[in-house]
Amino acid sequence: MYKRQKYEKNPVLTAKDLPEGASKVDFRDPKIWKEKDGYFYCVIGSRPADGSGQILLYRSADGFEWEFVSVLAENKKRYGKMWECPDFFELGGKHVLLTSPQDMLPEGLEFHNGNGTLCIIGEMDPETYTLKEETVQSVDYGIDYYAMQTLLAPDGRRIMIAWMQNWDTIAHRCSDSKWFAQMS
């Protein structure tokens, strides 16, 4: 049986590791992966001083000591507010950033009111480590698909799973139900 031992230097990222103006409260949902260059990378949802969302990028050689690399993507008050649950990967020669913005407003038929999904496709600048947007779209057009995450399967498929719930309806739990919300 595996016995977990808490790392003595927890937390590995603290307020001192945030870029200037980033909220110490709205800093959450890390997604970590290892790249071909041997480094671990981590994207984290954050809220800058203007109240909109941003995605921070960190790097580590060992998974314990982390350095801030860049603000990978900024909302600039375009798509909701706080950006949660980021995921970042390469697919078909493009870079893909997934995130779940809070308090979205509709843009025609593309987005709906409330908490939605966002897929930003583009190229990552190798010098600035920022994502140059080419396409921005919803991942799902319903209201109960949030916080999607992916994994790369051994056969090369990118598999996505999401929370089949949303923040607007979470308080409406049926008391006689054994289950409430689930992953897709």
Language-model-detected regions and their locations in the chain:
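Beta-rich carbohydrate-recognition and catalytic domains
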Residues: 1-29, 34-79, 92-141, 162-184
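Beta-propeller and closely related beta-sheet repeat lectin domains
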Residues: 28-31, 84-87, 146-149
